[in-house]
Amino acid sequence: MSGWSHRHVLDLASFSRDDYATVLELAHRFRSMPVTGARKLPALQGRLVATLFFEPSTRTRSSFELAAKRLSADVQSFSPSSSSLSKGESLLDTARTYVAMGADVLVIRHRCTDVPAQLASELDQAGERTVVLNGGDGQHSHPSQGLLDLYTLAHHFDPRNSQLDALQGKRIVIVGDVVHSRVARSNLWALSACGADVVLCGPPSLVPDAFAAFLDAPPPGQASDPVRERGTVQISRSLDDCLSGADAVMTLRLQKERMTDHLLTNLDRYHRDFGLTHERLRRCAFSGPVLHPGPVNRGVEMSGGLLDDRSICLVEDQVRNGIPIRMALLYLMAASDPVAESSRASAPS
């Protein structure tokens, strides 16, 4: 297993291929726990993981907390509605409270971009040992979702190894509300790093032409791209054209709560033009997997029948794979010597 150099995990733009490989390899081993009969590992015993979610979440929060518990970490949950934030306490002071309690990892979700990065910078300047894991910030990034989507696809194409090479040269379609999606941005960094070619599909209001140049410059805040050669990004306005010849398709939730400019007014028309159904997949001779990061608007992004078809739709696999991926991240960030310990008996083999 290669080295791990990330103190905080704030985005995937800073990940190298070795970083992706390290996470996927470890997650694949953790995924075998139910098969081998092991339900809990002592790897993070005595560590404290605090989940600070300033936005509603079911899957991500529960997945992180279950991942931490499977590594024997203590978990402290934060709820804004019952916190001192309602009394005027700042977000930073709230986070410092958990640091003072001895939190080793802060998993943070916030509606504003860069809040996790700002907090990580504050902690570094103060010399604190606590690390920050971005659970989703604004429209910027959702690293663990991008990684679990990557792993789900790698496992689908190569169940035995589930490694990066399984995605080399694959054509992956991402359809829907790209402009508001931190998931889409994380997937663009992850999939392109593995050599996949990504096609973004949707109306101009949701998939602006500017996304065609998403990978053209070095990642924000970096002098160079940590990935030497990436796959490509293209834009299409026709879902039928995209699906013909595609290896997989991911559809994104319409984030109506972020649509302040009435970007979409007719959901029936959207479903007709960009919704996934069995009939559309047959018409386009598409036989690959269908993904969705959730939650799903049935009858909008995809039909209820397709969502429930486990032979095609990998939504439940994504949820299931989120646990070992988040276990891997927590393990790499909080274990005293994660690279060395990952080969010991405390991790599954």
UniProtKB/Swiss-Prot annotation:
User: Which biological processes are named by the entry's GO terms?
Assistant: 'de novo' pyrimidine nucleobase biosynthetic process; 'de novo' UMP biosynthetic process; amino acid metabolic process
Q: What GO molecular function annotations does the UniProt record carry, in alphabetical order?
A: amino acid binding; aspartate carbamoyltransferase activity
Write out the pathway annotation from the protein's UniProt entry. Pyrimidine metabolism; UMP biosynthesis via de novo pathway; (S)-dihydroorotate from bicarbonate: step 2/3
Q: What are its GO cellular component terms? A: cytosol
Family statement drawn from the similarity comment of this UniProt entry = Belongs to the aspartate/ornithine carbamoyltransferase superfamily. ATCase family.
Cited HAMAP family? Asp_carb_tr
- Quote the function comment for this protein: Catalyzes the condensation of carbamoyl phosphate and aspartate to form carbamoyl aspartate and inorganic phosphate, the committed step in the de novo pyrimidine nucleotide biosynthesis pathway.
Tell me the protein's name: Aspartate carbamoyltransferase catalytic subunit
